[in-house]
Amino acid sequence: DVAPTSAAAGGREYRVSIALKSPADDSAARATFLRWIWYAARREGLHLNGAYDDFSTPARVQMAMRTVVAPALRLSLTDQQSLIPHAKMVRYGTDEVVQYAGEVPTAMTFLIRGSVRLTTTTEDGSVILLSLLEEGSFLGLTTLTRQPSNSGAYALEEVTALEIAREHIEDVVLRTPLLLQELGRIIEDRQKESSRTGHPERVGGQGPQPNPGLLSARPNVK
């Protein structure tokens, strides 16, 4: 596969080029790219085309902490309050990558709304479907061990999540030995799942080989 490229075009604009398998894919690829960059810009606090976003409000963060994070990690009220200032509400578009395999996550991600599919890639490049994570689940656990994640994750629909950076979630987990033990077990289970030989469902080979056709878009990011 050919990775997309980007270059500054002046005037706070950027030109992004995406390799296509066929010119017929132009419209669909452009629509997907613009949708994904809309979500990505808001996650990073960028003002795409001058737009402002206040999705991660204190009220939303507090609600997500109370209804999802606290039950998942069995947090006390004190722990919840200590994490709220360091948590951020984010959204991902359908089919967008939420977690990359082989990278060390910088945060734990708790699913508030929507679902994601965990995947792993075999030596021959085939993508294998692993488990489905739904509301109330979490990913990015290997941020605590500073190890690369064995699995990738992509959104099956619009996903709303709460992210808590490693240094802040780590402080809470290390104070709770039973929680640390349970999270360690989950990490081990997911690693076993991603390396299981069996006969899992495959969702493709090495992927389509792009041709020289390129899609270009020029988002304005401030």
Put a short name on every predicted segment:
Residues 134-135, 165:
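A secondary-structure boundary/capping signal
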Residues 63-129, 135-141, 149-151:
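Regulatory nucleotide-sensing modules
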Residues 28, 32, 36, 148, ...:
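Charged, alpha-helix-enriched surfaces in structured cytosolic catalytic cores
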Residues 2-96, 195-222:
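Solvent-exposed, non-transmembrane regulatory segments of membrane-associated proteins
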Residues 21-23, 121-123, 158:
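Short coil/turn motifs at secondary-structure junctions
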Residues 99, 162, 170:
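Nucleotide phosphate-binding site architecture
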Residues 145-167:
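Ligand-binding loop in jelly-roll beta-barrel domains
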Residues 38, 167-208:
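A small-molecule sensor/coupling module
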